[in-house]
Amino acid sequence: MSGFKQHTGLVVPLDAANVDTDAIIPKQFLQKVSRLGFGKHLFHDWRFLDDAGERPNPEFVMNAPRYQGASILLARENFGCGSSREHAPWALADYGIKAMIAPSFADIFYGNSINNQMVPVRLTEQEVDELFQFVEANEGAQIEVDLEALKVRANGKEYDFEIDEFRRHCLLNGLDNIGLTLQHEDKIAEYEANIPSFLR
């Protein structure tokens, strides 16, 4: 995986709190085990007026022409609550989301997002309110998420955020659990070479 250092992108404002993982990716789309192909089902029950996903809901913010191609999602508190399905961050990443900004995220969703190389940024409710006002008032508004500096930049302002240093290291270097394990490949090989034959 390539690392995440800084990203500037178009922002889609999803003005809803307590968005759960069943809304992010409904249960009928969970049969696959590959991470690919879930983006077309992202927020399916909100984005579409039919089960087949052929009639876009014109009232849903992500269908608005001005937000097409958005790579940063702005949301309200407790984003990603509900079941722990990893398909939720898979769907967001496959859709093209690189970073999410909200006052809070559900704990398991937060970790799963980082494992899938998306940056979940926690700002205060007041700061998130300011960003909503900026994005909604300015078509084409972009926000910069700088993981190296731990800053969000928008409308000439900077907002500081925090992230656990280990998770930040993983994001900066594009490391998931497998990548972390492979960093110790030489030690693993050494251990395996010294396993007694009766244990192999």
Swiss-Prot record:
Protein origin, superkingdom? Bacteria
Q: Which UniProt keywords apply?
A: Amino-acid biosynthesis, Branched-chain amino acid biosynthesis, Leucine biosynthesis, Lyase
Catalytically driven reaction(s): (2R,3S)-3-isopropylmalate = (2S)-2-isopropylmalate
Molecular function in Gene Ontology: 3-isopropylmalate dehydratase activity
Tagged with keyword Lyase: yes
Top enzyme category: lyase
What single Pfam family name could you report for this chain, choosing any that match? Answer: Aconitase_C
GO annotations of cellular component type: 3-isopropylmalate dehydratase complex
Family annotation (PANTHER family): 3-ISOPROPYLMALATE DEHYDRATASE SMALL SUBUNIT (PTHR43345:SF5), 3-ISOPROPYLMALATE DEHYDRATASE SMALL SUBUNIT 2-RELATED-RELATED (PTHR43345)
Q: What HAMAP family is this protein classified in?
A: LeuD_type1
Annotated function: Catalyzes the isomerization between 2-isopropylmalate and 3-isopropylmalate, via the formation of 2-isopropylmaleate.
Q: Which NCBIfam families match?
A: leuD, PRK01641.1
State the similarity comment.
Belongs to the LeuD family. LeuD type 1 subfamily.
User: What is the protein name stated in its UniProt record?
Assistant: 3-isopropylmalate dehydratase small subunit
Source organism per entry reads: Vibrio parahaemolyticus serotype O3:K6 (strain RIMD 2210633)
Taxonomic lineage from the root: Bacteria, Pseudomonadati, Pseudomonadota, Gammaproteobacteria, Vibrionales
